[in-house]
Amino acid sequence: MNLTNHFLVAMPGMKDPYFQHSVIYICEHNEEGAMGLMINAPIDITVGKMLEQVDVQPVHPQLNTSSLTKPVYNGGPVAEDRGFILHRPKDFYESSLQMTEQISVTTSKDILTVLGTEAEPSSYIVALGYSGWSAGQLEAELAENSWLTVEANPDIIFDTPIAMRWQKAVQMLGIHASQLSDQAGHA
């Protein structure tokens, strides 16, 4: 089982309050563990403020200031000082990984210099930190019914209002959120 390019959707009975109602985009999943980014947990800082704090100046003069008001996301509890940008592929940056034709993840600082300009990716989210699992840990959580999984949809990441992302991810499974029980168990 490889869940790269899938969503982890928290079950209603998720015991860990940090991940309640979270949707996590899985960037990597292999025998060593898994790594992903929460896509529905905005924090109280905008992209523009974050760029000011890390002292990054745009390299292109044509500013697109509306994108600087986007929220930054809490990607997860690991390495919260590290930034990750999920975006629609446009240019290649120093450290980018194209996950699909419609989703890339970049960790290099060069992408920050184009945010807020005409040269920025058409859609993106900035996350600080990531969610990580050691070997076998995610599989154990899946066996405990902590998560649902579904193939990732870029429209949920980039175009769905933040408050609707969990519900839309559940709907991709062909069910309504009200059909989910907050009680875990096995038949």
From Swiss-Prot:
This chain's protein is named: UPF0301 protein VV2869
NCBIfam families linked to this entry:
PRK00228.1-1
UniProt-listed Gene3D superfamilies: VC0467-like, VC0467-like domains
Task: Write down the species.
Answer: Vibrio vulnificus (strain YJ016)
* Record family assignment: Belongs to the UPF0301 (AlgH) family.
**InterPro entries this protein is in?**
AlgH-like
Q: Which GO terms describe its cellular component?
A: cytosol
Against HAMAP family, the record matches this protein to: UPF0301
